[in-house]
Amino acid sequence: YVFLIQAFRDEKSISDRIKVLLNFPPAGHSALDSEIEKIEKVDNISYAEKQKLAIKTAVNKGILILTGGPGTGKTTTLKGILRLFQSEGLDISLAAPTGRAAKRMTELTGKEAKTIHRLLEVEWDEHDRPTFKRNIRNPLECEALILDELSMVDISLFASLLNALPLGCRLIMLGDSDQLPPVGAGNVLHDLIESRLLPVVELKEVFRQSMGSLIVTNAHRIVNGEKIVTDRKDGDFFLMERQTPALAAKTIAELYAERLPRAYSYSPLRDIQVLCPSKKGEAGTVNLNKILQSLVNPPSDNKNELNSGFRLFREGDKVMQIKNNYDIHWDSDKESGEGIFNGDIGIIEKIDLKSETAFISFDDRTAQYAKEQMTELELAYAVTVHKSQGSEFKAVIMPVVNVIPQLCYRNLLYTAVTRAKELMIIVGTKDEVVKMAANDKKTRRYSALKKLLLNDAAPAILGTTGI
């Protein structure tokens, strides 16, 4: 193997910490079946056998990967695990890689979830580089950590998180291995599952309440390489045939600005998201953002504007942070802090021309941006599928026309479809959708994590000078 030295250290650290966690299992629970039955009675539910297995494994083993597609009951299972941990009086922390994923986790569980960066209390070293206050010398105080969207977590962040876990801490990880790998290095979820060293429960059964959804049905059909269903007029999944990128862009603009708001009372800014395979081309994010900005947030004497880099931003614009920034200050009703992270989506509420600053709301937080910091923003009426990971939207519109071969693969289509909660519309050609769903080749990630997990000895680090 040839490694970047930091990548080796991260993967070796992950391997070592996982083995330590496996060596400190919790005491078994003697009356687990009766406790599960109590939860079923109180919540008026009936767990499937795989869900019961996941709950028992989480409690008895103390470490678990829970994976499965939409509609398979991951959230219901998570709530059961959470209830049992709470009944044991454990101090529980919930975390996710992005602000939106953490917010969704909070809404689903009723317990506050934090981003991994917030949980680890990010701070800065003398070179103004991010470090974490919580680490192996100053571990977290939780007795159980539940981590969602593991597929998005790269090796660097996962290594930092594991190093901050105290001995004996239970670790429950949720993710969907059919989604895209993280933007950063590694493929943690895939490698952990492939190692077969950790307990893994995969939920496959789609529950009755989800079976009527074509979004759920087609997501599973895509994963299995099957033909998707698009001919149900009463469904929540539609394909609008358009043969060229120009025609697709025109249709997307109409759907976003007029047809969906009129038919479904959706807010273009808050409820509808265009997800593109690529930035480039007439049906790419750059062109679509210009079109959609002109339609839903046109110039006005009442709206201040600010140029930053080559981008024009206007009050009322939907924007996305495109890199982690640990310096930007934000305030919410409950607290204040620093840090706006890659993939966070917000609305420009106000631009102060005198000070050349913008005030941007990111869900429940408001951040103040200086003009030079706005170079880290892009318009977000349309974003790439990669940037949408960890988010959900009421309605998703996706162009699938003239997709370049490097992006014409199954897990990109699957990731886009699983972002939609209520409505999914593909604008393009059926042939390309079929081609995309049939291509199960995944972006190859070069990693030694699986090998490190399975081997007791790691290769020596040679020739590290200058790496």
PLM regions and their residue ranges:
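Interdomain "pre-motor" coupling segment immediately N-terminal to P-loop NTPase/helicase cores
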Residues: Y1-A31
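Conserved helicase motor core of P-loop NTPases
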Residues: S177-G339, E349
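C-terminal accessory regions
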Residues: N224, D333, N342-I467
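N-terminal pre-P-loop "Q-motif" helix
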Residues: N44-N60
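Residue-level recognition of short, solvent-exposed, well-ordered loop/turn junctions
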Residues: P166, R314-E315, F341, S388
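Conserved RecA-like ASCE P-loop NTPase motor core of nucleic-acid helicases/translocases
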Residues: L64-T106, L174, F237-T244, A248, ...
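Conserved helicase motor core of SF1/SF2 NTP-dependent helicases
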Residues: T57, G80, L84-L90, P97-L108, ...
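N-terminal pre-Walker A segment at the start of P-loop NTPase domains
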Residues: D33-E49
